[in-house]
Amino acid sequence: MKNIFISGGGGYVGTNLVQELLKDDYKIIVLDTFWFGNYLKKNKNLKIIKKDLRNINKSDLNNIDCIIHLASIANDPAAALDAKLTWDVNVLATYKLINLAINQEVKKFIFASSGSVYGIKKEKKVTEELTLQPISEYNKSKMIAERVLLSYKKKIDLTILRPATICGYSPAMRLDVAINALTFGALQNNLITVYGGKQIRPNLTMHDMINAYKFFLKRSFKKNRSTENTIFNLGFENLSILNMAKRIRKSLQINSKILVKKTNDLRSYRQNSDRVIKKGFKPEKKIEDAIKEIKIKFLEKKIINKESYYRINTLKMIKV
């Protein structure tokens, strides 16, 4: 399985994933709008298609063995900005992609869903068996996309991943996700602003996210397998926002002030990832590793306060 198609391969996760897979001698086709910039390095085994996923056609998937579907309107604020765009990209384009994949006899399909599809849960162990109760346009669209894909599982080797909030460096950086935003605030302003603080959020390092894709890329499963062998949580550190702030300050070894502000957003999310661990996947990094990596890149001036690092700001500026 050497020919990999990655939708959204120019994004925060995709940019790192592409470079890692190229090291393993995969041939990669990336389809992306590159709304947030193109940071992919030229490579003889990399083909770039600058195109909106909604406009994908059959020829884009010629001779493809596996699709890794990353493209989406990501996070709650960005998705709420234009609900129609969110549903068109996250659901309808996913429907189009899976149909073309089956018509082109693609063997494997790996989908980047979200750990937020569970909604607000009181359970301490949020496992894959729990009922999905999404509360935002973003996680509702991810849930429906999952259901669309599951209706095709008899026809393709399907894996659905539900990652927690990802942290760590990427050339296509994001400063609108928890650990990254708090770390940047500490480095840039010597201030960590926390809203609420008691909310629990699951975390996943970029390193482990990339390794998870590589893990499932190498695994061969039967079509129409059970949900237990199809859907996997990927979240390994369930932490309060205030705890994150304290660990960031300790990891950076600076005396940043932690400013706690009131908020109406008291949502807490937890994830249990025992299922994927039982399959043989093991996380290798902690949030401290991501924090230290961000510090290094900040000192190298590879992370600055750039508009494209905030997804909602960029979407407001462009006409889609």
Predicted regions: what they are:
Residues 4-23:
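N-terminal Rossmann NAD(P)H-binding glycine-rich loop of SDR-like oxidoreductase domains
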Residues 7, 31, 67-70, 109-114, ...:
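SDR active-site strand-loop-helix element
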Residues 44-55:
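Rossmann-fold cofactor-recognition segment
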Residues 53-89, 100:
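NAD(P)H-binding glycine-rich loop region in Rossmannoid oxidoreductase-like domains
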Residues 95-137:
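Conserved Rossmann-fold NAD(P)-dependent oxidoreductase catalytic core, especially the SDR/UDP-sugar
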Residues 141:
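Active-site helix of classical SDR
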Residues 147-201, 206-215, 248:
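NAD(P)-dependent short-chain dehydrogenase/reductase
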Residues 190, 194-320:
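C-terminal substrate-binding subdomain of Rossmann-fold SDR/epimerase-dehydratase oxidoreductases
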